[in-house]
Regions:
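An amphipathic alpha-helical micro-motif enriched in hydrophobic residues
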Residues: 34-87, 91
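Short, small-residue-biased leader/transition segments that mark boundaries at the very start
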Residues: 1-3
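Generic structural signal for hydrophobic core residues of well-folded globular domains
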Residues: 18-21, 65-69, 111
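AMP-binding/adenylate-forming domain of the ANL superfamily
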Residues: 5-18, 36
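Basic, alpha-helical terminal appendages of large translation-related enzymes
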Residues: 69, 75-118
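Active-site flanking loop/helix segments enriched in acidic
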Residues: 20-33
Length: 118
């Protein structure tokens, strides 16, 4: 499998490898199968017992997740940036409203409910 641009960030490289795998019929038939594979990889991560095994399984989870994004026709880089911004905005909301008596989890849920994500 030849991926020409070795300067791409790992997220983009993985996405490109997944697309190439599809052309070689080394891919799942549909989104549901790709999602099942992701869940399987998450379970393997959960069951791993050593740090090295956990790291290896985490890489597999990332790779499978990027494959799921391909089935959704979602650019993983863009979707990750959106999620990061959502987290930052919600964290700012929590930071702005926190006091000694306030439960952070309650504020977080409030931020989610009020769509504090853009």
């Amino acid at each position: 499998m030849c991926i020409r641009d070795r300067k791409l960030p790992p997220l983009n490289t993985a996405f490109k490898v997944q697309r190439k795998a599809k052309t070689l019929n080394l891919s799942y038939k549909n989104y549901d199968e790709a999602l099942d594979d992701l869940i399987s990889e998450i379970n393997e991560l959960k069951e791993a017992t050593t740090l090295e095994d956990r790291k290896s399984e985490l890489g597999d989870v990332y790779f499978s997740l990027i494959n799921v994004s391909r089935y959704l026709e979602a650019d993983p880089e863009i979707e990750l940036k959106k999620s990061i911004q959502t987290f930052i905005n919600r964290a700012k909301y929590v930071e702005k409203h926190i006091n000694k008596e306030t439960d952070i989890n309650v504020l977080w849920q409030e931020a989610k409910k009020n769509q504090i994500d853009s």
